[in-house]
């Protein structure tokens, strides 16, 4: 198949175009469809109403993540609605011969953690899932985006979607990250400067020497939060780091097929003369450990900065900043360091992988969680949990006073028992700090890297992780 020149986004889009619709939209073939228990039940119900089968069940993979409790594996689940949702997913997968990675299978976990670790996510794919953070999979050089329930139905029935093609913005970061600065800080820095709506209508191509130095798990963290900057998808061009990560994984090509796949994947990378709709550049040296202070992921500061005054902000941002200060009970001009913390959460599809847990464990080893602070670690998958336990990371965390949990989405969102209470404030390695996001209508969330969360747990307040390294 001949392939036009241009960006990876252009190439992958062209390869998966079925037709241009009268509306001007593209009918795009979806190579991999990931489903979970929250956004799939209604989609399956709509298929049943129409008497439609799942067209390509082998291109759909299911797991359970959002609603599972992390403190027990017992069935039935204590929450009757959660148990009903899980049973519905199990029944739908059986009825349509869809592979299901269930609790205790060794493959269950957060959908955006398990697909990459199983080798399901590969360069050049189009990937859809009824979940905002599907952009995670772009770390492999895939075009991946979240969809709604009606679109989940469309993919199940036709394996295609009707979509408007996005513009492409190159987000270039150059240089080496300093000690104590992580991928989470990179994406929070980018969103702070480009805005939570800055990427609307765009795909973000993350490029530059910094990304060449990042591991696949670090690239996943960045792409995961592209959506928080308004970009429906974000991606990194595949390279040797990508191929080394995928080689030998359960669903990766084997033998001769592997060699052919790698040759194909190499050709997908954006060409040197590719044209972009916009290009922005950042220097790694300007990025410090970063903490959100408000109610959007774009409201953040470096850990050694003070919170912005309203007058220092663009006029368009002042109203939501004032709203954030009132909700968070913080003051313009105060340092973010020293903000007291009640709960510390390490996990999520953003930062629940083995490298995240290793970074956090380095901080807590030989130290103790501050009395009065509730701290817990939720591995992103059963595979991550097993690997962490094989390395003794669970022992390190438990000795420090952290709770060691089972895999799931946990306190990232309010769909399971892990929730903030009242006005509690959390240091969280998750991706959203919206009002009420972590379960309490008045709960408050500060987003930061897993290592920064670990440092906050020890200090009982926001603190600079660099002092712990």
Curated annotation (Swiss-Prot):
Lineage: superkingdom: Bacteria
Biological source species: Thermosynechococcus vestitus (strain NIES-2133 / IAM M-273 / BP-1)
Pathway in which this enzyme or protein is active: Amino-acid biosynthesis; L-leucine biosynthesis; L-leucine from 3-methyl-2-oxobutanoate: step 2/4
Described purpose of this protein according to its UniProt entry: Catalyzes the isomerization between 2-isopropylmalate and 3-isopropylmalate, via the formation of 2-isopropylmaleate.
Binding site for [4Fe-4S] cluster: 349, 409, 412
Pfam families per record: Aconitase
Required cofactor(s): [4Fe-4S] cluster
Keywords noted in UniProt: 4Fe-4S, Amino-acid biosynthesis, Branched-chain amino acid biosynthesis, Iron, Iron-sulfur, Leucine biosynthesis, Lyase, Metal-binding
Self-association state and partner proteins as the record states: Heterodimer of LeuC and LeuD.
The enzyme's E.C. designation: 4.2.1.33
Catalyzed reaction equations: (2R,3S)-3-isopropylmalate = (2S)-2-isopropylmalate
Ranges for region Disordered: 424-443
Top class in the EC scheme: lyase
InterPro entries listed in its UniProt record: 3-IsopropMal_deHydase_lsu, Acnase/IPM_dHydase_lsu_aba_1/3, Acoase/IPM_deHydtase_lsu_aba, Aconitase_4Fe-4S_BS, Aconitase_4Fe-4S_dom, IPM_dehydratase_rel_enz, IPMI_cat
Protein name: 3-isopropylmalate dehydratase large subunit
Gene behind the chain: leuC
GO MF annotation terms: 3-isopropylmalate dehydratase activity; 4 iron, 4 sulfur cluster binding; metal ion binding
Family membership noted in the UniProt record: Belongs to the aconitase/IPM isomerase family. LeuC type 1 subfamily.
GO BP annotations, alphabetical order: L-leucine biosynthetic process
Annotated cofactor note: Binds 1 [4Fe-4S] cluster per subunit.
